[in-house]
């Protein structure tokens, strides 16, 4: 009798079978009986089966047709589980607060991050994500060259909980993995400005080797740059990529106040 193999999809999905990892992911996400939780790339339902015991509502999102059928049979009697068969990039993300606990398809990590931490900024509360180690480590570089990474750190506390070995998955991946915890910060920010804020970051990072002083002078007057430096404790001689997320946000908010809109980056 031939042993049935689990499918390995083009998106790089590897199924979590480590019960300790599953327990830690759920604990780190601080799930309550009031939460709606998305399980992106639900696979065989190894995470979903634990989430449904805690969360108010679990949405298991899976793109593999055979696995979608399996999930629907497995959770046919679970009133708080909704199985959605689609690529997460085409999924209608909730317009209300939600969390994510997921072992995501590694191949679409960047897209998932953008959907959660940029497009869904107003409703994504955070959670736990198991993903490839390399892109996780890039989130914690001392110098941030990627505008989206600056954006994510502005609005979320990101924590690399620990590295995860290949033996925690079926089939075992050839790359190292990690457990990432995400918590949204409590900031007073009008989310209608999120695209403008990203444009502001992107504009100033076009020449990442410029000093903070030189980069800011492309938007602010010389006297305004000096004032901003004193107000927010900026090192004007440091590279622009060395600004902290809070300094980025403060500079942006200052631009909204003192720079005419026609001079704002777009």
Curated annotation (Swiss-Prot):
It is an enzyme of class 2 (transferase). It comes from the Bacteria. S-adenosyl-L-methionine binds at residues 14, 16, 41, 62, 87, 103. InterPro entries: KsgA/Erm (IPR001737), rRNA_Ade_diMease-like_C (IPR023165), rRNA_Ade_Mease_Trfase_CS (IPR020596), rRNA_Ade_methylase_Trfase_N (IPR020598), SAM-dependent_MTases_sf (IPR029063). Keywords: Antibiotic resistance, Methyltransferase, Plasmid, RNA-binding, S-adenosyl-L-methionine, Transferase, Transposable element. The keyword Transcription does not apply. GO terms for biological process: response to antibiotic. CDD domains: AdoMet_MTases. One of its GO terms (molecular function) is RNA binding. Its EC number is 2.1.1.-. NCBIfam families: Erm23S_rRNA_broad, erm_F_23S_MT. Belongs to the class I-like SAM-binding methyltransferase superfamily. rRNA adenine N(6)-methyltransferase family. Involved in erythromycin resistance. This is rRNA adenine N-6-methyltransferase. The gene is ermF.
């Amino acid at each position: 009798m031939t042993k049935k193999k689990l499918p390995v999809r083009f998106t790089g999905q590897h199924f979590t079978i480590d019960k300790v990892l599953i327990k830690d992911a759920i604990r780190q996400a601080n799930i309550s009986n009031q939460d709606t939780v998305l399980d992106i790339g639900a696979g065989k339902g190894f995470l979903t089966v634990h989430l449904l015991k805690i969360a108010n509502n679990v949405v298991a999102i899976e793109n593999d047709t055979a696995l979608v059928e399996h999930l629907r049979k497995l959770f046919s009697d679970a009133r708080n589980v909704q199985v959605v068969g689609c690529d997460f990039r085409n999924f209608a993300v909730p317009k209300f607060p939600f969390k994510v606990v997921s072992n995501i398809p590694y191949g679409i990590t960047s897209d998932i991050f953008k959907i959660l931490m940029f497009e869904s900024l107003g409703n994504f509360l955070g959670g736990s994500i198991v993903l490839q180690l390399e892109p996780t480590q890039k989130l914690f570089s001392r110098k941030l060259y990627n505008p989206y990474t600056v954006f994510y750190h502005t609005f979320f506390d990101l924590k690399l909980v620990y590295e995860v070995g290949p033996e925690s998955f079926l089939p075992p991946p050839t790359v190292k993995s990690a457990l990432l915890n995400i918590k949204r910060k409590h900031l007073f920010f009008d989310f209608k400005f999120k695209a403008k804020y990203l444009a502001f970051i992107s504009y100033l990072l076009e020449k990442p080797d410029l000093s903070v002083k030189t980069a800011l002078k492309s938007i602010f007057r010389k006297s305004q740059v000096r004032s901003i430096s004193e107000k927010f404790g900026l090192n004007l001689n440091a590279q622009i990529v060395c600004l902290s997320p809070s300094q980025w946000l403060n500079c942006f908010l200052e631009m909204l106040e003192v720079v005419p809109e026609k001079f704002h980056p777009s």
